[in-house]
Amino acid sequence: GRDAYIAQPENCVYECAKNSYCNDLCTKNGAKSGYCQWLGRWGNACYCIDLPDKVPIRIEGKCHF
């Protein structure tokens, strides 16, 4: 797994306010844990710890929402 911003299918981050929301989202996707990274590169977004390689992550380029 890797530590990364989990992405929606369109390469968009999951915006957040609470750590609990991100922890639920990340663990449902197989990560060890997750939290809401405030004021990060893509604003307030969910960041997952040890997320499985099969789960998409935010990469360079635009978010096509």
Curated annotation (Swiss-Prot):
Subcellular location: Secreted
Pfam family name, one: Toxin_3
Tissues and organs where the protein is expressed, per its UniProt entry: Expressed by the venom gland.
Listed InterPro entries: LCN-type_CS_alpha_beta_dom (IPR044062), Scorpion_toxin-like (IPR003614), Scorpion_toxin-like_sf (IPR036574), Scorpion_toxinL (IPR018218), Scorpion_toxinL/defensin (IPR002061)
Top-level taxon: Eukaryota
Function: Binds to sodium channels (Nav) and inhibits the inactivation of the activated channels, thereby blocking neuronal transmission.
Protein name: Neurotoxin Bot2
Gene source species: Buthus occitanus tunetanus (Common European scorpion)
